Structures are given as structure tokens and as C-alpha cells.
Amino acid sequence: MATTYLTRTSGSPTLNTKYTLSFWVKRSKITYSECFMFDGRVDASNRFKLAFDANDKLGCFNSHSGSDTISFGTNRVFRDTSAWYNIILAVDTTQGTEADRVKLYVNGVQETSFSSTTYPSQNDANNVFNENSSALIIGAYYNATNVFDGLMSYVAFVDGTAELPGIFGETDSTTGEWKIKTTITPSVAWGNNGFLILKNGNSLTDESSNSNNWTLGAGTLTKTEDCPSNVFATMNRASPTTVALASMANGNLYNGDQSPNYWQGIPGTLAASSGKIYWEVKIEGVWGSTSQNTQRHGIADIGAAVDNNTSDAYDIQWTTAAYGIGWCNTSGVRNSGSVTGTSDYSTFIATNVLMFAMDLDNLKLYLGKNGAWENSGDPTSGASGTGAYTIPTAGMWAPYSETKYGSDVISWNCGNGYFRTVAISPAGSPASTPGIFQYQI
């Protein structure tokens, strides 16, 4: 949604003293200018916003006739780009205790630590997001600036009731994780302005009992397989890295358009110590020389990289400890701790799609290109590791890429089924589950 926002004009509310806004959000871009998730406006003196500020704190604001009726900001920050947050704003101005009139929940838990608070007076009915003829926007400020960069899902609004979190999610009895409820049933009713959009896809058609559809204001609304119930890895914007973060885009799955003359490394989110993981890297561009390494793609042991990297970045030191494996564009595969590496892997060029299958149960990494596994590799071979590169040690391993020049441009596909904005077609056959990939293991 980096340039995308949605619009709607509200109708006459069922009850403007009570409402609930619930949504799931996964951030892509962090620690930059204020980014609006929700905006409402009657005029310059009657406004509403729910946004992350430049320091990644969450704030809510409502003004009536130029005076704040709601204003608060969290002390906590929201910088986990691997996570889906369920954020719920519940308003009931009929409550006698002012702190009960506005409640904010994150993943089912009420927020109570705020840098400042302004609560509405009792029975205040000037709530702009649920006011007749308010111009509503999801994903941007009213003038299409301060656009939100990330993913949203299950955006629900209940008019007339301040709901509890259990309407929208529940705690997993085994893991303790807050998980989504894919069937939302308000305790009373949706109310006149109630809606439910972005349910299991990019549809702007209201899937509540109403017909309060939304309209695409600008940009392209892309469906992702990454969702609150099935999270996929991305490049880790929150990690220590020398990558120019401004060049990252498309949900942190694209890295390019940089111009330094030094190595820039970025690890993935969702590092693991066990299990089997598959992902793809498309080489969108390579620096002109065919005799010099300017790209390395593979895996990094996140804990070891942090412990051993004195520059506070993820650029792997290839002459020291063994905490990374990189497939170089001209000279084969290198295990950190070995400068020479292994040359019996093919080179790669622009337009190639690299395949990575990481088997952490057997400490094997399989490398492939354009649908064929290198060294006749067989990712299903288990402990025998047919054609695999041996992962040197157990650890917390994640996908990893390094590039050197501005023309070294790459895209990852960890299951969303896109390289940048281009959908994969045809997808691997049979269809990959979960996720959509160019090739099938």
C-alpha cells in the first residue's frame, strides 16, 4: 500500500457515541514520517486520525470545532516488520469513567501506557470517523500524503457498540498467540456505518451485513498470501544493515536502485533453527562486469552474525567465522571462513530466478536456478543431502542477500507469488502450499 489508499463517505450513524474499529496490519516501512492508517474529515476543524508517528508510536486524534476530544499516543513502539498486529479502537463516550470511554487494544491486550491522554466528555457525540458525510480514507492523510506502507487485512468497523477484542480474535490455548477470527459477528449488530473489507484478499466490497463498499483512491491494491493466519518472510528492515532502506519496496521484498561501491547485506525475517524452508530470488539486474562478484545470495546465522560483526551490520565477513553461505554471481558458493569457496556452481545473470531449499533438520542447503537444482540436488533426500551444500553449524538461519552496486537489483519471493508487482505465471505445478512460487520443489 506504499502509494495506495482507499476512500468512502460515511452515512448517518446508528449511534455516534459508540463504535469499534478493528484491523490487522503488518508494517513494511518504519521510523520515517507519520504514516496514516485511517483518516476522517468533515473540515479542517473536525478531523480524525489513527497513525504511526515518525518514532513508530501509535496515536489517535479526534477534534471537534478545533478542540481535541480524543488525543493519545503510546509509549511503546511498533517496529516488528515480521509481525501482524491486531489493533482495536473501542469508543463509548457514555461511560462514567473517562478512561473507559476510549480503549486501545493490541493483540487482545489493552494498552495502558501513554505519553499523553485526552478523553472525550461524557456522552460526546462528535466522533468524526462515525459522523454523517465524513470523508474517510484508509492508508493516507486526507490530501494523499503520509501514505501507509505495509499490509492490511480484516478491516472491520462496528457502528453503535464498543466491542471487546474477543469479537475479532482469540488466544491460542497452546501457544498463547493472539490469532485472527475469520468469522466476525458483532455482539449487537454492524450498525448503519459498519463494514468489513480486505477479508481474505483485496476486495473492497463490504462483507458485513451492509453494503458500505470502499473505493480505490489511488495506486494498486495487491492481494498477498501473507496474512494474519499465514505469515511469510521478507527482508528485515528492522535489522542492523548497511542497505539504503529507502531503496526497499514492495513489502520489503525488493532491494535496488542503490549507488554505493561496497557490499550491502540484508537478512530475512522469521529466522529458524529447525524445519524446511523454500524461497526464490529474482535477479532484476547485475552490474555490467561478468568477471567480478557483485551479488551473493544464501543464508546467514542471525545470532552469530550479530555477535561477530563489529560494524553493526549484516555484511558477512567471509574470511572469519562460519556464519553464512553465499552463492556468488561469478565464482560459485562461499562459506564464510573460506575465501575460495566452491566453484562447481553455475553463474547467474539478470532475469535468472534462484531457488533455495533450506533443510535445517539435516543442516543442508540446496541451490537451484530457473527450475533446475545445482549438482543434481534433491531437497527430499533428507540426511543423505544429495547435491546439497552442508550448513556448517546449528543456529538461527534466515535468507540473506548482499549486493554491491546500484545496478545490482533483486526481488525475493517467499510465497506471495510476486516479483515486485508482477504476478508469477504460471506458478509451480502442482500449486505450492502454502504460498505461490515460480518453481515447485
Per-segment meaning from a language model:
Residues 1-5, 96-98, 115-117, 151-212, ...:
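Extended recognition patches within non-cytosolic domains
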Residues 21-29, 87-89, 138, 152-156, ...:
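Short hydrophobic/aromatic patches on beta-strands that form ligand-binding or substrate-lining surfaces
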Residues 3-61, 96-98, 161-166, 270-274, ...:
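Extracellular glycan-recognition modules
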Residues 1-3, 22-30, 49-124, 341-344, ...:
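Extracellular glycan-interaction surfaces
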Residues 126-152, 403-404:
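Extracellular glycan-interaction patches encoded by glycine-rich segments
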Residues 296-353:
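Glycine-aromatic-enriched beta-strand/loop faces of beta-sandwich-type recognition domains
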Residues 1-19, 69-79, 141-144, 180-188, ...:
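Short surface loop/edge beta-strand patches of beta-sandwich-type extracellular domains
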Residues 1-17, 54-60, 64-68, 132-135, ...:
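Low-complexity, glycine/proline/serine-rich flexible segments
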